[in-house]
């Protein structure tokens, strides 16, 4: 239980599609925009026809995921055409009875996993064009899939990836150890991530990509290392280490090409108590983190770049908080807080200074992580021995379970990467 309690206590946007003649926006607070999704195809056989229809349905579900669009097969002022000339799919948009405008195309491979990812990317492109809000279906969620022994202490957990709908579950590590708190590095198109592994006997920070089963230790620093976070803007790695006895917050200059640069810098002294859960602002100049200097864990914000400023308390409403995470748009911070004995997901609005409780169910929630649109979160929920992943919409205030299978699913992190399979229409 100590490991889990300690981790709890301390615990990429799609490329912009420009279309000069097509200006269609909806706002998050508006009603859903109906969008007819039509498949135009002449399949050579029933099997191919069924496959194309399944891709059309997946595309529609992807569009609906953002809670701004309402895909339909009925007539609507706005239509997205998917013209199938197998293996090519051409995507066009028709508005208010005007001529359809070709946007882009993609080529199917016949491999369901690859084709589904291509459809996710296509849906996210269309979603951005129609709403000016990033689509989130193509993002990958990485998490730790763990087992327990009779004492309920986490003993082994490999890292896995999964789509938002629970499909295409895939192992990332094969280290026969405990791996926790994975975090995407959000470096352009490179699917690199950092995480903590116990494979050396003590927790150390490792770097890996989706193509490798084992990671590489990135710091020579003594002591245990926990909860890494990386800013691609300032090229700073933030993490927690007990090198000097107390779990303290450190930053380290880091390059994906050359590794650690210089020596780690401790940001605060022992007077700030136990520190944990660092998360960078999108521009990399500020951190939010947890400290128990006042007796209970609370969330603080601090500028660290280009010069360091003193920390300040972020929220006074909740006194037992953890796991802060900065939204991609920089406007909100999601976090966990114990409310009436249950750890719930909350969000703090930086402009208004207001807190909002987002969940109310009886399960303890942990490790919120933002989707690229800053309107959705993934988090884990359960008990000391069971844990599942859930998606939460800030628009609808509803959660839904990601159905994956057995085992404890913890420490989710939602990443997004530029499209790899889309070609602009000529």
UniProtKB/Swiss-Prot annotation:
GO CC terms, sorted: periplasmic space
Family under the similarity heading: Belongs to the TolB family.
Protein keywords: Periplasm, Signal
Main location: periplasm
Gene3D superfamilies found in the cross-reference section: TolB, C-terminal domain
InterPro entries, per the entry: 6-blade_b-propeller_TolB-like (IPR011042), PD40 (IPR011659)
Signal sequence, start to end: 1-19
Localization in the cell: Periplasm
Protein name in UniProt: Protein TolB homolog
């Amino acid at each position: 239980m100590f490991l889990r309690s300690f981790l709890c206590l301390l615990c990429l946007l799609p490329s912009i599609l420009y279309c000069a003649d097509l200006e269609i926006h909806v706002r998050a607070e508006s009603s859903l925009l109906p969008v007819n999704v039509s498949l135009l195809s002449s399949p050579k056989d029933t099997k191919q026809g069924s496959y194309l229809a399944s891709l059309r349905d997946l595309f529609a579900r992807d569009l609906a995921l953002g809670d701004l669009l309402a895909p339909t097969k009925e007539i609507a002022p706005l239509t997205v055409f998917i013209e199938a000339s197998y293996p090519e799919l051409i995507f066009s948009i028709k508005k208010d009875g005007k001529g359809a405008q070709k946007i882009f195309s993609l080529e199917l491979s016949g491999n369901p996993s690859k084709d589904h990812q291509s459809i996710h990317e296509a849906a996210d492109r269309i979603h951005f064009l129609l709403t000016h809000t990033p689509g989130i279906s193509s993002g990958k969620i990485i998490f730790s899939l763990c087992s327990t022994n009779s004492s309920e202490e986490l003993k082994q957990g490999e890292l896995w990836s999964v789509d938002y709908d629970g499909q295409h579950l895939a192992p990332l590590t094969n280290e026969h150890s405990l791996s926790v708190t994975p975090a995407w590095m959000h470096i352009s198109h490179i699917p690199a991530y950092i995480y903590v592994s116990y494979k050396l006997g003590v927790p150390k920070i490792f770097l890996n990509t989706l193509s490798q089963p084992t990671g590489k230790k990135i710091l020579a620093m003594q002591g245990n290392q926990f909860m890494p976070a990386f800013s691609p803007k300032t090229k700073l790695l933030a993490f927690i280490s007990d090198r000097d006895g107390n779990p303290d917050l450190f930053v380290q200059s880091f390059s994906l090409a050359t590794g650690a640069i210089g020596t780690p810098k401790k940001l605060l002294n022992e007077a700030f108590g136990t520190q944990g859960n660092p998360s960078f602002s999108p521009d990399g100049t500020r951190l939010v983190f947890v400290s128990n200097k006042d007796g209970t864990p609370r969330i603080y914000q601090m500028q660290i770049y280009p010069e360091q400023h003193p920390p300040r308390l972020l929220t006074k409403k909740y006194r037992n908080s953890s796991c802060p995470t900065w939204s991609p748009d920089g406007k909100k911070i999601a976090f966990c807080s114990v409310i009436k004995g249950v750890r719930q997901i909350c969000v703090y609005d930086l402009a208004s200074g207001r807190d909002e409780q987002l969940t109310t169910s009886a399960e303890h929630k942990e490790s919120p992580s933002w989707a690229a649109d800053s309107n959705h979160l993934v988090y884990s929920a359960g008990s000391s021995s069971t844990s599942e992943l859930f998606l939460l919409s800030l628009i609808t205030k509803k959660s839904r379970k990601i159905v994956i299978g057995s085992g404890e699913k913890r420490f989710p992190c939602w990443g997004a990467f530029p499209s790899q399979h889309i070609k602009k229409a000529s």
